[in-house]
Amino acid sequence: MSSTPIKHYLQFSDFTPDEYEYLLDRARILKAKFKNYETWHPLHDRTLAMIFEKNSTRTRLSFEAGIHQLGGHAVFLNTRDSQLGRGEPIEDAAQVISRMVDIIMIRTFGQDIIDRFAAHSRVPVINGLTNEYHPCQVLADVFTYIEQRGSIRGKTVAWIGDANNMAYTWIQAAERLGFTFHFSAPPGYQLDPVMVPASASGLVKVFDDPLAACQGASLVTTDVWTSMGFEAENDARKRAFKDWMVTTAMMDRAEPDALFMHCLPAHRGEEVEAAVIDGPKSVVWDEAENRLHVQKALMEYLLCGRY
């Protein structure tokens, strides 16, 4: 084993602004190669283990296709057909799995699970989603904004909806990349101060009125009202969030060239109007595709360093 410390990607705050500048540019290059059908196999014969405790379409497809396009292979594991669902300690699973593969992506529940796994892994670990953070998605969102509008530094991102893993990851991104984050949610669904780092507090503004939160925003974004694992609260959440649907009126409060994003899957008529997500300011399909390209850049960087 190399004595060089293993680099993981467990939160957005794990990387520096300089690393993000490199990664985002590298994603642009890899996307261009993909569009031009250029073969690029820096991860030839490398193996990615994908561990899913929470189901997903976009996460599995983007990582599995991504490692293949870089010349590697993917192995899919879930709790139904592995010892992970039969009580094997996380630390033991990490020790074993990381001796057989080159890189690991985990989509799970608590952040503590992935932190414990990474602490005992011999290879890089990537957060595919936890209850607390979703760094790969926000990385794709930032890349999509830059691709469409240029630098995000100094801009305003408006989040309309629950204080969930996406919201907390956007806060970390604001601190790392230098933009303002507007947040609006109904009472009872506000940000947890413990999850807002002191270094980002000056960049975060909380609004009771979602229309006011969208004022001057360059990007308006949202997510489902009921995240995975909170299904029992669905009816209560629908009642609480009924005035926090992203509407054309909210988009009209934003900058004239503002974009709309949603990490998907979306529920039209709940967290977003059909006229918004299917309208000219929506870039949700580019956003979804870009998971593929930023994650390729991420895996390449974690395994190969910089080119």
UniProtKB/Swiss-Prot annotation:
Q: What is its EC number?
A: 2.1.3.3
Tell me the name of the encoding gene. Answer: arcB
User: Would the keyword Cytoplasm turn up in this protein's UniProt record?
Assistant: yes
Q: What is this protein called?
A: Ornithine carbamoyltransferase
Q: Which Gene Ontology cellular component terms are annotated?
A: cytoplasm
Q: Does the keyword Phosphoprotein apply?
A: no
Which pathway does this polypeptide act in? Amino-acid degradation; L-arginine degradation via ADI pathway; carbamoyl phosphate from L-arginine: step 2/2
Q: Which residues bind L-ornithine?
A: N165, D223, S227, M228
Entry-linked PANTHER family? ORNITHINE CARBAMOYLTRANSFERASE, MITOCHONDRIAL (PTHR45753), ORNITHINE TRANSCARBAMYLASE, MITOCHONDRIAL (PTHR45753:SF3)
So what does this one do? Reversibly catalyzes the transfer of the carbamoyl group from carbamoyl phosphate (CP) to the N(epsilon) atom of ornithine (ORN) to produce L-citrulline.
InterPro entries, per database record: Asp/Orn_carbamoyltranf_P-bd, Asp/Orn_carbamoylTrfase, Asp/Orn_carbamoylTrfase_sf, Asp_carbamoyltransf_Asp/Orn-bd, Orn/put_carbamltrans, OTCase_ArgI
